[in-house]
């Protein structure tokens, strides 16, 4: 592998050039900005790197996905999942450079999508090019799936996979993301929480009323907050009947993996300005277990009454909120939605209207997977530090569509670092992270072909 690794280092400027080309083309899915050009740009880049590439039509006129494939003499097929859509760059005034005019400053590369997720695309292409240039072939059959709607919840991915299922089959998948923590230890996750987002609303009056009528008129915002509060007890535990019934307890290996995760409380406390340990979270093990293995119920937003400048004394006629529920493996978002509806009726909130906005299933790969063993051992060789494995991330994503529907184990491996400012101004990636990520991918490809 020494020749492959040397090639990655020797051609790093070419990799950066490819990355800059992708970052220069906006692809902001939340604003539907840049998709007249971005899909074909990515498709053509894959073709330039030797892959047979095509655009995959997305249901409901969604942003196209890009599919690339390259066969080898192997009987194994590895899938790469990434996405080319990015977050909005706002607030623009906090950027030190134009988010879509990438810049190199020292060892860092700046621009929207530099790390999430175009950096991962570039790193994987660098690994592919190294094998093709040095060995004239890949060690394993390869499929490259690049989504265009990940940042807006992959809302059309399920339908796309049902349509293109025959060409998307593979033996295993390397997920987008992954990378290292602050101390440089590789982070590998093998699962993602699912999710359900709902909108709840109530209209108690025909029009807003003067607040002097508040002693005799019902307040929609008061009614809505009571409905939301009914879903948790004073300890913040979810008390919706049936909500936890399907959850399967973590096994010994999964618990040990979570308990081996580092103590990041100080970093989080400094970042968010709160004290995390105390009350029901007595230790870092309690915190990590809650963060990575428990479902959640969270209020995203509340809209009601007057929120403009100055003051306006009213009894709000209408109120609405949006909530998201992060779900753990074996929870079904459709079933959870029904439990929420029944809960509201049972607690006397039949006047609250509820609407599902988005759902995604949870997924987790087995801790004894051959793929995980390959990703771990290769990570240790590249980064020279013991990798940390998380049975699933705290967040959600479309992993079930590949792992559950297409029946393949999934592990993450990537170029991420906590200082990359993903989803924030001045998103960046270091050249070292880009190079190490490419080498890790290359070694995974080689080892995967040998099992």
Q: What does each of the following model-derived ranges do?
A:
Residues 1-90, 318, 322, 335:
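N-terminal helical capping/dimerization or prosegment-like subdomains
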Residues 115-191:
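Acidic/histidine-rich catalytic neighborhood of metal-dependent amide-processing enzymes
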Residues 61, 84-86, 108, 145-154, ...:
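Acidic, glycine-rich active-site loops and adjacent beta-strand->loop/helix elements
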Residues 187-203, 411-415:
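Flexible glycine/proline-rich, aromatic-decorated loop/lid segments
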């Amino acid at each position: 592998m020494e020749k492959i690794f040397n090639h990655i280092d020797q051609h790093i400027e070419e990799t950066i050039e490819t990355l800059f080309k992708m970052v220069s083309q906006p692809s902001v899915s939340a604003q539907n900005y840049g998709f007249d050009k971005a899909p074909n740009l990515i498709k053509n880049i894959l073709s330039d790197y030797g892959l047979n590439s095509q655009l995959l039509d997305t249901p409901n006129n969604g942003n196209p996905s890009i599919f690339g494939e390259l066969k080898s003499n192997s009987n194994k097929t590895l899938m790469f999942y990434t996405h080319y859509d990015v977050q909005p760059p706002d607030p623009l005034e906090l950027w030190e450079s134009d988010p879509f005019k990438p810049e190199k400053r020292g060892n860092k590369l700046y621009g929207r999508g530099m790390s999430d997720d175009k950096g991962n695309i570039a790193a994987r292409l660098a690994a592919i090019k190294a094998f093709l240039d040095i060995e004239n072939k890949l060690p394993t059959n390869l499929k490259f799936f690049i989504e265009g709607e990940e940042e807006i919840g992959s809302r059309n991915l399920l339908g796309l996979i049902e349509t293109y299922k025959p060409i998307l089959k593979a033996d295993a998948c390397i997920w987008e993301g992954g990378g290292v923590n602050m101390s440089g230890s590789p982070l590998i996750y093998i699962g993602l929480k699912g999710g359900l987002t709902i909108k709840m609303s109530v209209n108690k009056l025909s029009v807003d009323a003067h607040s002097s009528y508040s002693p005799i008129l019902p307040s929609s915002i008061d009614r809505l907050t009571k409905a939301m509060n009914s879903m948790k007890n004073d300890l913040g535990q979810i008390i919706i009947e049936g909500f936890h019934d399907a959850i399967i307890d973590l096994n010994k290996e999964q618990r040990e993996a979570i308990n081996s995760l580092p103590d990041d409380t100080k970093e989080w406390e400094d970042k968010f300005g709160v004290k995390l340990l105390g009350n029901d979270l007595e230790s870092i093990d309690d915190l990590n277990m809650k963060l990575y293995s428990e479902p959640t119920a969270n209020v995203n937003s509340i809209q009601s009454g007057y929120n403009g400048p100055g003051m306006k004394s009213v009894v709000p006629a209408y109120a609405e909120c949006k909530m998201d529920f992060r779900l753990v493996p074996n929870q079904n978002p459709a079933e959870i939605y029904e439990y929420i509806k029944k809960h509201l009726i049972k607690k006397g909130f039949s006047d609250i209207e509820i609407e599902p906005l988005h759902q995604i299933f949870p997924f987790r790969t087995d801790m004894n997977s051959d793929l995980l063993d390959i990703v771990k051992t290769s990570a240790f060789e590249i980064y020279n530090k013991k990798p940390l494995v998380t049975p699933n991330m705290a967040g959600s994503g479309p992993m079930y569509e590949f792992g559950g529907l297409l029946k393949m184990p999934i592990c993450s491996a990537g170029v991420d670092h906590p200082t990359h400012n993903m989803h924030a101004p001045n998103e960046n990636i270091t050249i070292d992270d880009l190079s190490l990520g490419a080498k890790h991918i290359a070694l995974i490809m080689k080892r995967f072909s040998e099992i």
